[in-house]
Regions:
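Asp-based, Mg2+/Mn2+-dependent phosphohydrolase catalytic module
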Residues: 1-5, 79, 102, 106, ...
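N-terminal helical cap/lid subdomain that shapes the substrate entry/recognition surface
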Residues: 2-99, 109, 120
Length: 224
């Protein structure tokens, strides 16, 4: 029986599509390197972002700015990354919940729920507040000083919920950060595959796969 649900934030309940990042990449190219493909620049930025060394904890804002600085340097662009990060954060703060989220959360009323997100504390709470979304527990990578899929961030949520992992289902869009991370602790998992990608050989296997959150109340009801 599912006694609690933990949710990833971005890509799961909050829509922060790639278009925001490509918008910033276009601004960089237009202002400093006409002719540079914004997608190629964003791929380079992504490479530094996802390849960041997280042994020494940095906030998500710090990782984002540092990875942008490295991408700028790789292309020989002498520009301060900070103004672009400010613009990016301003756009992200306008992010909205996916259309089905409020209906789904209402249908799950009575089940304790938490957000477990690779995000900075004030940033995430501001977005949740603007979208009028309330959760019993909000755990961020900043408050945990650890990023998913590391166990600590999930452990803090479980401790706050006071429910054993076997009775908690985690819902997220990342096979590695969400599905693998939660599964290692014995939590059940629901993969939100909004883009319809196919899992590759060796990818983590969720207990359930859904296209969006619409079916989540029924999924939760059916899980043993």
């Amino acid at each position: 029986m599912v006694r609690a649900i933990t949710f990833d934030a971005f890509g799961t309940i909050i829509d922060t599509g790639r278009e925001v990042l490509i918008h910033i990449a276009r601004e960089v190219c237009a202002e400093h390197r006409a002719g540079l493909d914004p997608e190629a620049f964003l791929d380079t930025w992504d490479r530094y972002f996802f390849g960041a060394d997280t042994e020494q904890f940095l906030t998500l804002a710090e990782v984002t700015e540092d990875s942008l600085a490295k991408a700028l340097h790789e292309y020989g662009i002498e520009a301060d990354p900070r103004p672009y990060i400010d613009r990016l954060e301003a756009l992200w703060l306008k992010a909205k919940a996916y259309p089905e989220v409020r209906t789904v959360l209402a249908a799950l009323d009575g089940i304790p729920r938490a957000v477990v997100s690779n995000a900075d504390d004030a940033f995430l709470k501001g977005i949740l507040r603007r979208n009028r979304l309330t959760f019993d527990v909000v755990i961020t990578s900043e408050s945990a000083q650890a990023y998913k899929p590391r166990p600590r961030i999930f452990e803090l949520a479980l401790k706050a919920l006071r429910i054993p992992p076997a009775d908690v289902v985690h819902v997220g869009d990342s096979l590695e950060a969400d599905i693998a991370g939660a599964s290692r602790l014995g939590m059940r998992t629901v993969w939100v595959n909004r883009s319809g990608v196919r899992r590759g050989p060796g990818d983590p296997t969720p207990d359930v796969e859904v296209r969006d959150l619409s079916d989540l109340p029924e999924v939760v009801r059916r899980l043993p």
